[in-house]
């Protein structure tokens, strides 16, 4: 999908103008989605964090829908970029939108093994690659080569601050038993419908269309 977007957007006469709008801090709400996304792809996570509050919720959501998937699979590696961008974002409303999103929940399920934890009868992994939530009721275990632990932990802490301990625990507790494959399938179908509303065609739909014309 991204390759197609790049090709289409390069033909858009206002691409350089959009990049100027991004750099100048002007409003972006009326800019067509495809060229806006392409113009923003050159930004590092720090600059994207400053851009996020200037986007509409719909624009932010479409950016994630486009960027986080390889065909019908979530791409956890690409998620690291957005994790850093939202972690650095200074607008609480935007950050809270992200940590309450289904994408963030699915990301946590993809990266972490989540276990209940009993402080009176603690059961720790036999390695150091884990952390406890601030209420010490959940243990998040991760692979030794995962590098975005501090950012993920900080956003989980934000979730607790927003929802309160009881509701945050109840929300994250579902990670213990939820099926990743089922969650991913549901999210893929929902993101496909959202993108279709903006005129985007996903990989498999594009493949079907190309086969029809062979």
Residues covered by each model-derived region:
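Alpha-helical scaffold segments
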Residues: 2-50, 54-109, 115-116, 132
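Extended alpha-helical scaffolding regions
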Residues: 103-201
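Conserved small/polar residues in nucleotide/adenosyl-binding loops
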Residues: 212-214
């Amino acid at each position: 999908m991204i390759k197609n977007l790049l090709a289409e957007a390069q033909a858009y006469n206002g691409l350089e103008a959009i990049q100027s709008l991004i750099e100048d801090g002007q409003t972006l709400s009326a800019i067509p989605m495809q060229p806006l996304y392409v113009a923003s792809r050159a930004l590092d996570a720090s600059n994207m964090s400053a851009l996020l509050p200037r986007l509409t919720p719909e624009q932010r959501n479409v950016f994630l829908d486009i960027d986080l998937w390889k065909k019908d699979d979530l791409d956890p590696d690409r998620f690291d970029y957005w994790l850093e961008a939202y972690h650095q974002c200074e607008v609480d409303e935007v950050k809270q939108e992200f940590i309450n999103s289904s994408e963030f929940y699915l990301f946590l399920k993809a990266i972490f093994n989540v276990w209940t934890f009993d402080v009176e009868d603690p059961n720790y992994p036999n390695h150091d690659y884990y952390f406890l939530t601030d209420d010490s009721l959940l243990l998040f275990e991760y692979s030794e080569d995962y590098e975005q632990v501090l950012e993920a932990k900080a956003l989980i802490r934000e979730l607790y601050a927003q929802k309160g301990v009881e509701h945050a625990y109840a929300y994250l507790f579902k990670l213990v038993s939820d099926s990743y494959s089922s969650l991913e399938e549901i999210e893929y179908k929902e993101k496909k419908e959202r993108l279709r509303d903006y005129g985007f065609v996903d990989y498999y739909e594009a493949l079907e269309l190309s086969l029809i014309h062979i």
